[in-house]
């Protein structure tokens, strides 16, 4: 089964069998199928369910679950679990941890606390992905794979010792000599001149928190390069084992990452995590904000710039919050339908709701899913079924192209440069937001187009109007 095949629209949800007693599995899957959910995503935070102790692999848990899924006709997207390394790993190998700008390591207990450039983490990632893919990939329930989870989410800067070593290598390959680097970075200013690459570090705290903008732009390129290589490391392994027709994806879009490059190198298509009610969180209620959840049309247009047709791996289905912060209120009746159709209108052929059951423990205890804590049927589940019925009538739009005559030109270097320049950032963002809001107010379809080496004049010919505000590079 392919979920992006141009033939029909497909509904899914995110499920965590490790959170629930096995006696609930069959009933959960049965209720999903009865309400139009055909696909589930699993295992993105479950490293210890496969490798509880270093080098000791146990496949029984997910073997049992996948067999139940296959027996009931539920299809599965299986994830690599590298977003949350287990405690034994970070305790034994602290060099895998990411650090803040002052070099203080982020410790076990959260997620995404590793760094891409640790040779040890790359080694252990290779092992867990190889073991998982070689064992599970041929299972009939599995139709695709998700790499990691939300690459560059929460933290898209890396300051560990491994990152400094990798950054030096990145710069040596780019410039060839330290003199060329000094010239490009303008290091004569404030006597920043380097005599060797060993004197260069990832950006660190300085007296006035000032930065060399040329260094930081190269550093941002390096972060993107590191994330792309980490995704490709995993994709190359999975490709050796997957069944014909199965796919590889990951869920984005996050900062300091060239999503087009990552998709072209490692994925069959990209997916996105869509939480439109973030627009209403906290003090946003008091703001005169015309766009509100229509702001997510801008985000979805960015996704469409990466993949013409894409998937939504996490579509908001409930109130959102961690124990440390409030994020978004419960969708009103009909809002799940609105947001789902918003995603479909922008090119999503697959929409997966986050999550099936609301977790009863952990940081995301207030991040509600389709079902509340009781697990009983509710109005949101009824709305999912209603969406499925609508999908049945909309199959002819699967694989169709979003038609726009207005294009907004972007490129990563200018986007990254603007975020490190307080003068340029405000002007660029205000222009971008103003153009998007004008398009929304006039119901004018608009595309984002990223200028890359493979973009030609022919690619721009369909547009009657092109905006390219404030490029400085």
Regions flagged by a language model, labelled:
Residues 7-9, 36-38, 70-76, 138-143, ...:
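Short, well-ordered coil/turn segments that N-cap beta-strands
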Residues 19-34, 125-131, 252-263, 332-341, ...:
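Short, acidic/polar
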Residues 102-269, 273-298:
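Polysaccharide-binding and catalytic clefts of secreted carbohydrate-active enzymes
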Residues 1-24, 29-38, 285:
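An acidic-aromatic substrate-binding cleft motif
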Residues 26-106, 129-133, 234-242, 472:
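Aromatic-lined substrate-binding rim segments of carbohydrate-active enzymes
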Residues 197-200, 244, 275-278, 284-473:
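Carbohydrate-binding surfaces of carbohydrate-active enzymes
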Residues 13, 32, 40, 69, ...:
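Conserved, mostly hydrophobic/aromatic
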Residues 10-22, 43-62, 107-126, 150-156, ...:
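The substrate-binding groove and active-site-proximal loops of carbohydrate-active enzymes
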